[in-house]
Design a protein with these regions (language model features):
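Short secondary-structure transition/capping segments
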Residues: 43-46, 65-69, 130, 212-215
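Long, highly charged, low-complexity intrinsically disordered interaction regions
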Residues: 34, 46-116
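Positions that flank functional sites
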Residues: 38, 61, 208
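Short amphipathic alpha-helical molecular recognition features
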Residues: 7-11, 30, 34, 51, ...
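Short, hydrophobic/aromatic alpha-helical segments in well-folded domains
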Residues: 41, 50, 122-125
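Noncatalytic, basic helical substrate-engagement surface that gates or grips nucleic-acid strands
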Residues: 1-36, 41-45, 67-69
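Non-catalytic nucleic-acid-binding/docking modules located in mid-to-C-terminal regions
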Residues: 83-215
């Protein structure tokens, strides 16, 4: 546990403010919701057509019924830097021959942020069980002698379903506070070098690479 904790990052207000400052200098529009999971909020924005895609490495996002997900944009292990993975939610569940409710049960059964993994049930077994029994409730009723489900598992499942639908049909697009700004290359350069203390040569080289107007 201690070893894994070294790889975790606690998101503080200071980090959030730094990200906002960076986005402002870069001229990237952003929305900062007051509460809730970012993937949940972004997935609903995509579902209602406010954004075209959600960019994330967290595959739990598909459990929010995110219509279009882009992954591997920041995966440094990939040799090709011009390739990303795009997941189409509707095509995916159609290909799996699952309803949204069944796919959500499958995701929860595999283990997620809100529900633990059930011993001896991996992705392949979870899919077989969902295909056979359709719901987690039916799976528990018919296989409790074979699998050991955690205490209060059904309550955790129901809580997970609430969380995965937390923003569904609850975002008023007209009242969203979209923060916008013009790109400020000199401001960005000074911020990265003086405030973030990045190497000046690296900053200048990167800015020239990604912004043709920068001299």
């Amino acid at each position: 546990k201690k070893r894994l904790e070294k790889y975790t990052v606690r998101i503080t207000k200071e980090i959030i403010d730094d990200v906002k400052t960076l986005l402002n200098f870069m001229g990237v529009p952003y929305i900062h919701p007051a509460e809730g999971e970012g993937e949940a909020f972004a997935s609903e924005l995509c579902r209602v057509g406010y954004v075209d895609y959600v960019l994330t490495e967290d595959m739990d996002t598909m459990a929010y019924a995110c219509p279009k997900l882009i992954r591997n944009c920041v995966d440094k292990s990939l040799k090709r830097k011009d390739i990303v993975s795009i997941f189409d939610y509707q095509k995916m569940i159609d290909g799996l021959e699952l309803s949204h409710e069944q796919f959500l049960d499958f995701c929860i059964l595999c283990g997620c942020d809100y529900c633990p993994v059930v011993p001896k049930i991996g992705n392949i077994t979870a899919m077989k069980l969902i295909k056979n029994y359709k719901t987690i409730e039916n799976i528990i009723e018919n296989t409790s002698s074979k699998y050991t489900f955690p205490e209060n598992y059904l309550k955790m499942v129901n809580d997970a379903k609430i969380n995965f639908n937390i923003f569904k049909d609850k975002i008023n697009i007209d009242s969203l506070n979209l923060n916008t700004s013009e790109i400020n290359i000199e401001g960005l350069k000074n911020y990265l070098i003086n405030d973030i203390e990045m190497n000046e040569k690296r900053v200048v080289t990167t800015l020239k690479k990604y912004h043709n107007n920068y001299k």
